[in-house]
Amino acid sequence: VSNGCVCCVMEVSSQGIKMQRVEGIFFDIGVFLNIEPDHIGPNEHKDFDDYLRCKSLLLKQCKVGIVNRDDEHFEKIIEGHTCSLETYGFSPEADLRAEDAKLVGGKGYLGISYHLKGLLDFHVEIDIPGKFSIYNSLTAIAICRHFKVSEENILKALKVAKVKGRIEMVKV
């Protein structure tokens, strides 16, 4: 902060919440993408209910919670939240919705496009195909909306966003 940092993006694990590593930190935005039973064991969570409970605590430590409306555990995750909620997904009930998703392909190119509806309304195309990419882009868009990032800049950033090694074209 003293060096001019105005924003920090950090991953907060359920284990970090459980071990109180972020106790006393009140986040502007907390994001819930999804939950799968993959952190169960003696070193993390005793069972799925404990894992779910710990994940949901983030929504008591932030001003705004951005939550995947399509996750099957949505209702449990938001139970007892103290923040304002915004949702995203394919659900008609989501505040930011992806509609008309289509694979887009061409020579040496594979992507996905959809129409964003709800709190914002524009066409989105990303270079990484798959439903997970739509969810990731919806999350990014929801966060950008809070920082008043323009539609033009959101679209530019989504067009160049890449993860090395993930759905990467390999020339043969």
List where the protein language model places each region.
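Flexible active-site lid/hinge loop adjacent to a nucleotide/diphosphate
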Residues: 1-80
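Adenine nucleotide phosphate-binding catalytic loops in nucleotide-utilizing enzymes
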Residues: 44-52, 79-172
